[in-house]
């Protein structure tokens, strides 16, 4: 049995809805229920998905495919080319020293963690004058990274330090095949040739290095000294 209270409540609800809601505008959606007057729906209640009222309007403008992309990182070879070009054009001794330092740091990078670790150990052994240990490490290094000019240059240096001029020159030749601009290798070649009495050839090696680093004082001094010596021999 329906209670009287329920009937009264329904009647009051219907009356309230009818009093508060005006007749729906023509063409405007409305909520309709049996026994109740049509209730107009608010404008955003139809044709709108939940949460879409806060969504940013979608731009009809197509994305610009010509937007500039960030430049790709420069390769090691590109960085070296730039440093050597700046070195050749340098007019200042301090700038030259800084550029040579930057070149040396780049040339010490193998591109692999294992190679860099072996090189660090070899350099430490050289500093401690443990030349046998340094040679063993560098032998391994040139086997692992035969394309790495600095590995050959470091072994050339150790061989020079233990008076193995022939072995040092062989390694220097390999360095210059991989990196013809290697200043240390060219200077080392000049030192060995001069020590062996080949002053003309030593002078040419120093001059070649000086073309790469025109403001390096040690090379200037070597060229000046040997030029005088060679000219004196020709008199």
Q: What is each stretch, according to the model?
A:
Residues 86-89, 124, 158, 192, ...:
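Residue-level signature for tetratricopeptide repeat
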Residues 84, 101-104, 139, 173, ...:
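Alpha-solenoid helical repeat scaffolds
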Residues 127, 161, 195-196, 228-232:
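Register position in tetratricopeptide repeats
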Residues 71-74, 98, 203-204, 208-235:
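Terminal, low-structured helical/coil segments at or just beyond the last alpha-helical repeat
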Residues 112-184:
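Alpha-helical adaptor scaffolds
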Residues 21-111, 128, 231-235:
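Compositionally biased, proline/threonine/alanine/serine-rich low-complexity intrinsically disordered stretches
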Residues 1-27:
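Sec-dependent N-terminal signal peptides
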Residues 155-159, 189, 223:
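Residue-level signature of tetratricopeptide-repeat
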């Amino acid at each position: 049995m329906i209670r009287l209270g329920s009937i009264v409540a329904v009647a009051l609800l219907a009356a309230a809805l009818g009093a508060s809601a005006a007749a729906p505008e023509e063409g405007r959606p409305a909520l309709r229920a049996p026994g109740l007057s049509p209730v107009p729906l608010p404008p955003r209640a139809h044709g709108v998905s939940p949460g879409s009222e806060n969504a940013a309007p979608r731009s009809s403008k197509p994305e610009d495919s010509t937007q500039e992309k960030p430049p790709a990182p420069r390769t090691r070879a590109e960085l070296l080319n730039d440093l050597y070009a700046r070195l050749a054009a340098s007019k200042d001794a301090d700038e030259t020293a800084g550029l040579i330092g930057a070149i040396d740091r780049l040339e010490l990078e193998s591109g692999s963690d294992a190679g860099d670790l072996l090189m660090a150990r070899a350099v430490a052994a050289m500093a401690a004058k443990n030349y046998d240990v340094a040679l063993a490490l560098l032998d391994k290094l040139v086997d692992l990274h035969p394309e790495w000019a600095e590995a050959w240059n470091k072994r050339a240096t150790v061989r020079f330090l233990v008076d193995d001029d022939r072995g040092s020159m062989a390694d220097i030749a390999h360095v210059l095949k991989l990196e013809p601009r290697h200043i240390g290798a060219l200077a080392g070649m000049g030192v060995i040739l001069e020590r062996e009495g080949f002053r003309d050839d030593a002078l040419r090696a120093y001059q070649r290095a000086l073309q790469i680093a025109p403001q390096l004082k040690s090379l200037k001094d070597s060229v000046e000294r040997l030029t005088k010596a060679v000219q004196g021999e020709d008199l």
